[in-house]
Amino acid sequence: TGEIRNIFGEKVILCCGAWSKKVLNNLPIFPVKGQMLSIQGPENSIKRVLFGPNTYLVPRDDGLIVVGATVEDKAEFNQGNTPKGINQLQEGIKSLLPEALNWPQMEHWWGFRPCTPDFKPIIGKTQIVNLYVATGHYRNGVLFSAITSDIMFKLIQEKTLNNIETTFLKKFSFNRF
């Protein structure tokens, strides 16, 4: 919302996605814009996810098919769908399922993925006492959400990490930059 205010806590996790750098300036996080759209196909037109080189089609329970997604690393925080982005998605539809180009487009949207120079998240403690970070998951935020939240909980509660969690933290440490 653009609101600026002070927030206090004993321990704080910075998990602001693509906007994380606005809170902690030395984080090497930058936004990568992704545009998507949905189409309405005939009933049961596709029953599984279709993957192509630059596009995927995902059937949803409500009958819509999600078409994703562009990867625009120079877009910064420029909002809105663009003709170029929509065209790229349509080309992807054409390559995967040409007849779907005739199906009505229902929704268009965009978002900003938090990315790091090595495309890996930053997870764990920072140099600031009691400040933790969990950001930069790029296109894998949903995939890494469970293990990230488990690790962050254990760190904050000062619980013992297992070998996988310890390896995960080392690999994605803030200190690698």
Each model region followed by its residue ranges:
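A conserved short coil-to-beta-strand element within the FAD-binding core of flavoproteins
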Residues: 1-2
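Central helical "cap/lid" subdomain
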Residues: 5-51, 80-83, 99
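Short, well-ordered beta-to-alpha junction loops that form the rim of enzyme active sites
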Residues: 17, 70, 136
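Short, acidic Gly/Pro/Ser/Thr-rich loop/turn segments
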Residues: 20-21, 44, 74-75, 140-141
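Active-site lid/adjacent beta-loop-alpha segment flanking the redox-cofactor pocket in flavoenzymes
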Residues: 43-129
